[in-house]
Amino acid sequence: EQFGHTTDILVRRAFGNVYDILFQGTPEQIERWLLPCVLGERVFSVAFTEPEAGSDAAAIRTLARKKSNGWQINGKKHFISDGAFSDFFVITAVTDPEKKHRGISTFIIDKNSSGVTVGRDQPMMGLRGTSHVELFFDDVQVGPEHLLGEEGRGLKHALETLGRIRLAQVCARAVGKATRVQKLSIDYASQ
């Protein structure tokens, strides 16, 4: 709630993206990817939204094909909050098209991986101090250690993460903003 007294960017940094890796990551993934973020050394974004999928998270088209040495990822995402200055991304991709929503998995993709392109910034009304970009994945190769959580459980993990983010960012921030407005109103009325 106290973060609601400040700018939205602080709330996003404090609560935004840790849940996927914290709850689904292996000890090695937590050490490699999450710990540097907690220490303030790295930043990452979740990249679930796609142009063709809209609000239907199960309709994503980014595809991860299993290879002998890991995965090959192709696709695009958009409206990725903080994507311009993130060091890596947690993304969802279809790993088994036949299984529909049970065929979506979650991956950790380093921004500097060959084939990762950060596209144009997509301005959002009322959200200052952040960016919302397009991401493109063209034959991005990742090892098996980049699969986050269980194969085929990515949509479930993503929706759980979004629920936690909404609780932390939206609800707590709204209460914080309301108490801040109340205090400012009382201070003004007392003058």
Outline where the language-model segments fall:
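A short, Trp-centered hydrophobic/proline-enriched beta-strand micro-motif
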Residues: 40-48
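Internal helix-loop-helix
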Residues: 1-41, 81-88, 100, 164
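Glycine-rich beta->alpha junctions and the first turn(s) of the following alpha-helix
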Residues: 116-191
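Short Gly/Pro-enriched turn/cap motifs at secondary-structure boundaries
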Residues: 52-55, 79-82, 96-98, 124-131
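Short beta-alpha junctions and helix-cap segments that line functional grooves
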Residues: 33, 60, 76-78, 119-123
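A short core secondary-structure module
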Residues: 74-118
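Residue-level signal for inorganic ion chemistry
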Residues: 26, 75, 107, 137, ...
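A structural signal for short hydrophobic beta-strand segments in well-ordered beta-sheet cores
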Residues: 64-65
